[in-house]
A protein has these predicted regions:
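Long extracytoplasmic/lumenal interhelical loops at the membrane interface
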Residues: 251-287
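N-terminal membrane topogenic signal
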Residues: 15-17, 23-30
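Hydrophobic alpha-helical transmembrane segments of multi-pass inner membrane proteins, especially
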Residues: 29-238, 278-338, 363-367, 382-391
Length: 391
């Protein structure tokens, strides 16, 4: 009797475990389409952690999309100051490395125990909210050079702190975001072109201030453009390896086992992170790469259409700033992987491994949805050189 009872208990326990395993597999299967990276990178602890980050991101997206986005205008300045405070905290010399974890020579992450927080990611959202809030309150001020000073200061503060880490990749994304928001706010294009031209002429002066590894990347990139393969085994190893994997993918990609073998034996650094687009193309070919870019295109188009139909100045500027961040990040990351841009350490939104990056881009998505759900008025009309408001 005891034997029969024990046998029945074991069968029920086995069925329960099997059921939990199926539910876990079903959850991962349902979430995988939301993250192309899992299709291409070997599963394991990374996949489990990224599943958690994705769930957190989706929950954050839903929460952010519920209250009217106008409430976030009130939180813009505290959020901006908080983000600046975190960026300053990273640079404090007395903070131990057990808390601020250096990676590749950069002090850009705070160890929270369960995850590493990257303040530069959160700063993108806080910065966009702050600039959008400022430009809404200063309607028409951007028509003059003097009116561009304050948005410029708001931009250069986080840029300077990120360069100091050093995190040149994240810092570079703030310039296109600022330009996009100023255009929507009604700034004169002639003024913006002049500022861009002056910045381009002043760019060489920044070179001496770069870290040695950043200078090496630029030197390697110039050599790469000239067809010099002598650095393929040292400073350009990552770039040439990524390009070889992109070429190996061809039009239709490689079978799963062969693609994994190619990625493994070529020892591509950061294959789950900055260089994941090369892995996608190796596995799914040019078709998979174009499909990935097409999905980003749909996200950008949907966000811009949401901005177009909103008659609220803050909402429009906010969306365009967020779109500029995502679009610029995709452009730079893909450019790094195919060899048209130098490698500067930028993740691929929605795809690369990393909790801060993934949660941030889903919060951005939630803000875009929020503007769409709480929009007022109709398509944007222009009057007097800058958009009308319905604040």
């Amino acid at each position: 009797m005891r034997s029969t009872s024990a046998s029945g208990w074991r069968r029920r326990t086995a069925r329960a475990r099997s059921s939990r395993s199926r539910r876990s597999s079903d959850l991962k299967g349902a979430l995988r389409p939301l993250n192309w990276g899992w299709i291409c990178v070997i599963a394991g602890p990374i996949e489990q952690k990224q599943t958690i980050f994705l769930v957190v991101g989706l929950v954050a997206c839903a929460i952010v999309s519920l209250p009217s986005y106008r409430y976030f205008a009130v939180l813009a300045w505290p959020a901006y100051l908080g983000a600046i405070g975190l960026l300053v905290f990273l640079l404090l010399p007395f903070v131990p490395e057990s808390i601020v974890k250096p990676r590749n020579g950069a002090r850009g992450w705070i160890d929270l125990g369960f995850m590493d927080l990257q303040p530069a990611e959160l700063a993108k959202i806080a910065y966009t909210l702050a600039v959008a809030s400022y430009l809404r309150a200063r309607r028409g001020s951007t028509r003059t050079f003097l009116g561009l000073v304050a948005p410029g200061v708001l931009t250069f503060v986080p840029i300077g702190l990120m360069i100091k880490q050093p995190d040149l990749g994240s810092a570079m994304l703030f310039a296109p975001a600022l330009l996009a928001m100023l255009v929507v706010a009604g700034a004169r294009l002639g003024h913006l072109f002049l500022i861009v031209a002056l910045a381009a002429m002043a760019a060489p002066a920044v070179y001496p201030m770069l870290e040695s590894h950043q200078k090496q990347r630029i030197i390697g990139y110039v050599g790469q453009l000239r067809g010099d393969r002598s650095t393929a085994s040292d400073i350009n190893f990552q770039a040439f390896t990524a390009q070889s994997l992109v070429g190996a993918g061809g039009v239709s990609g490689q079978p799963d086992a062969k693609a994994r073998a190619l990625v493994h034996f070529n020892h591509l650094p950061e294959r789950h992170n900055d260089m994941i687009f090369a892995v996608i193309v190796c596995r799914h070919g040019q078709r998979g790469g174009l499909m990935t870019l097409g999905l980003y295109g749909l996200w950008v188009l949907g966000a811009l259409l949401t901005a177009w139909v909103s008659a609220d100045r803050f909402g429009r500027i906010l969306i365009v700033g967020l779109v500029a961040f995502v679009a610029a990040q995709v452009f730079v990351n893909v450019g790094m992987n195919i060899g048209v841009l130098p490698i500067i350490g930028i993740t691929l939104p929605f795809v690369s491994y990393g909790g801060s990056s993934l949660v941030t881009v889903w919060i951005m998505t939630g803000l875009v949805l929020n503007v769409g759900l709480h929009r007022t008025g109709g398509p944007v009309r222009r009057s007097g050189g800058y958009p009308d408001d319905n604040d």
